[in-house]
């Protein structure tokens, strides 16, 4: 499989060196994840007797991928505005607060912190 090499300028403090990143044109390496298994698991926990169509799962999966992409883009922009080379949890938290309505962002950040703590403890 042929791969192209793209050139990006790194905008970190003190580093103006170009970064070379391999770029693949394969559809399997597009970076999008499939969350259908997790969507079904959550549905069975919440409403055990109900099902969900594959089209609905595809729509929810697209929404999840889109939201993760928006959060990562906004967090990356915040990182560059602060002239930092490291993405911190605070950048992600601020990105969530910028993208989501106030109450929803508050719950998302709280549940996200709790999930990270459970992961660290296990």
UniProtKB/Swiss-Prot annotation:
Family: Belongs to the histone H2B family.
Basic residues bias (residue ranges): 1-25
Known function: May act as an acrosome-nuclear docking protein in sperm.
Highest classification ranks of the organism: Eukaryota, Metazoa, Chordata, Craniata, Vertebrata
Record bears the keyword Cytoplasm: yes
Organism (species): Bos taurus (Bovine)
Protein name (Swiss-Prot/TrEMBL): Histone H2B subacrosomal variant
Main location: cytoplasm
InterPro entries assigned to the protein according to its UniProt record, in alphabetical order: Histone-fold, Histone_H2A/H2B/H3, Histone_H2B
Tissue expression per record: Testis-specific. Restricted to the spermatid population of seminiferous epithelium. Not present in Sertoli cells, spermatogonia, spermatocytes or cells of the interstitial tissue (at protein level).
């Amino acid at each position: 499989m042929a791969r192209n090499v793209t050139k990006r300028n790194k905008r970190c403090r003190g580093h103006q060196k170009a970064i070379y990143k391999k770029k693949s044109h394969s559809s399997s390496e597009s970076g999008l994840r499939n969350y259908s298994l997790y969507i079904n698991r959550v549905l069975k926990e919440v409403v055990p007797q109900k099902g969900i169509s594959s089209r609905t799962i595809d729509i929810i999966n697209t929404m999840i991928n889109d939201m993760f992409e928006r959060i990562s883009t906004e967090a990356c922009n915040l990182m560059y505005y602060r002239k930092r080379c490291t993405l911190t949890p605070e950048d992600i938290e601020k990105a969530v607060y910028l993208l989501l309505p106030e109450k929803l962002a508050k719950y998302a950040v709280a549940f996200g912190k709790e999930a990270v703590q459970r992961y660290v403890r296990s």
